[in-house]
Amino acid sequence: MAKYKPTKLRIERARRVSESLSAKYGLIEWVPRYNAGEELVYTILSQHTSDINSERAFKNLMNHFQTLDAVADADVDDIEQVIRSGGLARQKAPRIKRVLNEVKQEVGSFDLSFLMEMPLDQAKKWLTKFNGVGPKTAAIILCFSFGLPAMPVDTHIFRVAKRLKLIGPKINADKAHERLEPIVPPEEVFQFHMYLIKHGRDTCSARFPRCNECNLGEICPSFGKV
């Protein structure tokens, strides 16, 4: 399958969006959040819950078990009890145990630094072969653990990108990852990701976007129409 190439219009619009949001939010520096194995677990815990809840559940998990090896060896019921504060613990506990054991069986450890040496597409393919690891989870690991130019697309980014027409109306969230990555230079992917999240949370909300407060009014095709 041929690699997607964005139109010049979308590339230029993304440049203007990034420039405007950079003026508003300033430089957001990349710093590694967790190692890749921990990021994998954290991402599972973050599904369908708030950042506060997922952070609490992750801290509880690591404080209790100390290492990912111990989590992988633990009973599912024990994991479930420890992560209960994060929500959907009954679904997430077996998912965490299963994927950790799959990774350990394949690699022998939870050191995934070898992914940095792979082409980005191959690193994504390697990660998404594991149960429960989709494009978003793979992109989060590659972006937040290694600083690679992978674009995680959450609900905020997906919504804002649709309204800005950076992606087409029929593109789903999974496809949005491959469509949004190439519209900005690789070194700006993390910044662009963070800018769109902040804009989605602060201004371009789902139900009542504050277009009157938006600094993208001259750029956005949906300005005042949502």
Language-model segment annotations:
Residues 2-226:
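Catalytic cores of DNA base-excision repair glycosylases
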